[in-house]
């Protein structure tokens, strides 16, 4: 950070969207300091650019999953090359359960380039080493680095593993809950601790006093997360969460639609709503000018800004699309299907998903259509509340769901309250975690009540890549009580 080197988060799927979220929260914090402490404005703007992110499939994957892309180590390696990283830069490879080839490929490539590479994984190392070639490639880099270090050899290469095994999933069939949550906690806490250290070293006591928020130790982040889970699973918070689940179940049982609106936490909620499609085989987000595809059950809009500006507030950096040609895919040994029909994942694709405050009749096109205002710590300003009440007349109904430190004054007739008290920190990581965990529970609870969870299996997963084909095979084998090998077509897995 002192040398303004890059810190780049690389990930896929749910963790990829989480990486974009951390990137955005980091930029928001430093850009927000410019008005508070203008004497350091140039330093703050430089610091905002230190952290960056990329996800497999590019930023388009934020709104719609890109099928099969995570199956290729070459894709992840190319994204590292395009990030123009070099010695002194840091690559944080958030590999989720260690199964995604693209992130393993980015970790290997980072190591080859002499980038300081950190590899986070949430499965037992022995299992990954024994059964997965794509994971073994990363561990071979780790072995080489350890051997060279022991011999006193410094060849400029650096890689460190950070195991985050959290045990078996209570509700299985998606990595988006336990695995992505623990990665957000670990990586987000590390970012905040680094930011706080820099601030203490470079600002005066009076300057520090106006920043606001607490500076936690790593142990205190763990304690805060324990508190988050305890509060959310008991008392008023649990009752509010259950009420929100019933609200959504009732809406969808009437073939209705839910449209969330928020500004400050738009990216957090977009992440959950996007993940519902592959996790529960629901209609994905559709482009604004697409009038033939099915409308997504849930959607998200920014009440303050039109589409182009709303997207700028989501990323707080230029949109990163993948401008890859057919020749690029051939060089990366992509499947013939991808070569023949390259997916539309350019930067311009993102803007075709309208999340701004433009009128969208498709969201209230059904008899049952619900407008849901999300308020976190009183983030719903008067302007947002007024927009909600104005737009509500177009919908059949609506509700305000309020999280965190909830002001006593009501802002709507119908409110669902989920009170949780957590520390406020520089990027507000604990409240981002609250929204993530709460919405994961909301969407999973809703799908469970609608029969899309059987036992503890999310049975309607959409098997669009090797990892999900494997997962679907395990579900079939478990429920049908047959050997795993009989649960899939080996030709499909490859």
Say what each PLM segment does.
Residues 1-494:
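Conserved N-terminal alpha-helical segment that immediately precedes and caps sugar-phosphate-binding
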């Amino acid at each position: 950070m002192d040398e303004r080197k890059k810190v780049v988060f690389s990930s896929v799927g749910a963790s990829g969207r989480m990486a974009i979220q951390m990137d955005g929260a980091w930029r928001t914090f430093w850009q927000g300091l410019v008005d508070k402490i203008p004497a350091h404005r140039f330093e703050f703007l430089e610091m905002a650019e230190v952290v960056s992110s990329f996800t497999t499939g590019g930023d388009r994957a934020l709104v719609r999953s890109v099928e099969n892309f995570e199956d290729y180590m070459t894709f992840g390696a190319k994204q590292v090359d395009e990030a123009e990283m070099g010695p002194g830069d840091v690559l944080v490879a958030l590999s989720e359960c260690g199964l995604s080839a693209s992130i393993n490929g980015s970790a290997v490539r980072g190591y080859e380039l002499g980038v300081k590479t950190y590899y986070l994984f949430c499965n037992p190392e022995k299992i990954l080493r024994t059964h997965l070639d794509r994971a073994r490639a990363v561990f071979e880099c780790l072995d080489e680095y350890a051997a060279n270090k022991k011999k006193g050899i410094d060849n400029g290469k650096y890689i460190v593993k950070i195991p985050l095994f959290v045990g078996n999933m209570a509700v299985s069939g998606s990595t988006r809950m336990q695995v992505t949550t623990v990665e957000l906690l670990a990586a987000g806490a590390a970012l905040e601790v680094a930011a706080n250290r820099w601030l203490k070293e470079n600002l005066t006591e009076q300057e520090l006093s106006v920043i606001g928020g607490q500076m936690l130790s790593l142990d205190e982040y763990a304690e805060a997360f324990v508190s988050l889970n305890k509060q959310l699973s008991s008392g008023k918070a649990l009752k509010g969460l259950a009420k929100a689940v019933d609200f959504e179940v009732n809406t969808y049982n009437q073939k209705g639609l839910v449209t969330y609106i928020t500004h400050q936490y738009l990216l957090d909620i977009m992440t959950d709503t996007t993940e519902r499609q592959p996790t529960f085989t629901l209609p994905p987000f559709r482009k604004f000018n697409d009038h033939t595809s099915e409308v997504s059950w849930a959607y998200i809009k920014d009440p303050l800004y039109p589409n182009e500006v709303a997207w700028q507030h989501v990323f707080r950096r230029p949109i990163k699309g993948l401008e890859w040609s057919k020749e690029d895919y051939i060089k990366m040994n992509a499947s013939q299907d991808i070569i023949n029909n390259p997916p539309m994942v350019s930067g311009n694709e993102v803007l075709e998903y309208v999340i701004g405050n433009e009128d969208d009749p498709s969201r209230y096109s059904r008899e049952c259509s619900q407008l849901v205002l999300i308020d976190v710590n009183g983030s719903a300003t008067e302007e947002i509340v007024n927009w909600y009440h104005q737009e509500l007349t177009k919908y059949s109904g609506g509700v305000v769901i309020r999280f965190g430190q909830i002001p006593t004054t009501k802002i709507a007739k119908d409110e669902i309250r989920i009170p949780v008290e957590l520390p406020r920190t520089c990027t507000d990581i604990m409240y981002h975690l609250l929204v993530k965990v709460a919405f994961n529970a909301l969407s999973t609870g809703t799908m469970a009540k609608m029969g899309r969870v059987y036992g503890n299996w999310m049975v309607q997963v959409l098997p669009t890549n090797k990892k999900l084909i494997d997962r679907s095979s395990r579900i079939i084998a478990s429920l049908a009580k047959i050997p795993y090998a009989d649960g899939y077509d080996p030709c499909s897995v490859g």
